[in-house]
């Protein structure tokens, strides 16, 4: 074995020592056809022998058929493309690397390129599923909350395997496998409730099962609108079957009182997020702007308004539920979580989104230090959703250094992230920034999105179920009584004004003057359960 060694505890010298080959390295596939002929066999040894004692330096995942720079000569690869995709999950490297070539960007199957764009390079958990040295190997790895199951066949015969995957029981999966012509194909399947799955592996072929981390829109049949009101600083739910007419589930009364969950005895800006595993998360601003009037504190603000500004606060309220009825809640104080944030002026309008690259939930929000201008920041929440794992980092700042940007809302469409936010540039209103990355690189667009002559804030974008239409809604606080406005788009360039609640096609049947909220998709069953629960309450 090239660079052969035995474990000597060198890992204790990290970061000066990262790893070593100590394996039949992948360049041998280029040097000699014999190694290409035996690639599948050797790949089914690595998990049992080399990776059993640690990471290896191995540049796997060849997508060239001919292993030279031009893909037109030299040795010939015997394994299938999906076999190669599986090795991106199967092999354990200290710093993950792949043997892709520049020409692969134009000649490799698109399904393979899309897989390689999203496959994680670090793993949080590994489980051995099945295998036999030199014959086949099936390994499951978890990144964040998403599982990948990789399988390779080291033989020249068809293998039929009976797998047990309890962590994926009943879930929808993306299934990468070889078709009859040994070409890569991507299918969608739903695993049985018992987690059992029969897998067929073609000779020197492979397969990858990927937990679907994206909500299946076809299963959705209703909409849930979360909002708050200034007079109560509490949380409200409204439901719609068609995305046009919304009815409050508790007849205009709070479902959770702000004084029961927040340090400042009130919440604002509730944002609800539905994770693909069915868990619901809500993030809210821990702030009551009328606490003095309500007799909840002796001063207008929690701290000196001259020093820390209007509406100063220091944290959020985070809530989590499996059924939209029973919720856990936690207060998260940024100043108590990270050193150096004692002078934080505000932490407003938190929203949640899943970062596919990081494999975890990102929270992004408005923040300022002292009474300086407001800017947009992001961090990552922990797995229990009761705290922050990473220190806030800058997400976006308005190009005019004298102006504030607040209330971000991020929507991914295709391979782009569209961030709508409020620009305090003249009359406050909604603008858009676009990036290829979720947490950086947003390009400023100067056009105003909303048609409102009066001040508005709190943009939230949501998709109409079964249609290529998106609705951006916003809180028009500059009118009296305040109301929500709506605009619709198909291209994120042109926006059609739908008017306000009860002044156009959008209706609020049993509530008025909602403030800063969000809309998500829910199933018809979930909508009916909410209606029934609160009717009986």
Q: Where are these predicted regions, by residue range?
A:
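Aromatic- and carboxylate-enriched substrate-binding clefts and catalytic-loop regions
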Residues: 1-78
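Generic beta-strand/beta-sheet core signal
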Residues: 2-4, 152, 176
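Histidine/acidic-residue-rich catalytic or RNA/ligand-binding cores of hydrolases
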Residues: 8-20, 111-112, 429, 480-484
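Glycine-rich, aromatic-lined ligand/substrate-binding cores of catalytic
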Residues: 66-143
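Carbohydrate-binding surface patches
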Residues: 132-169, 204-208
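Solvent-exposed beta-strand/loop surfaces of large extracellular or lumenal domains
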Residues: 175-194
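C-terminal beta-strand-rich structural cap/linker in extracellular carbohydrate-active enzymes
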Residues: 188-216
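Beta-rich carbohydrate-recognition and catalytic domains
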Residues: 216-347, 353-454, 464-470, 474-537
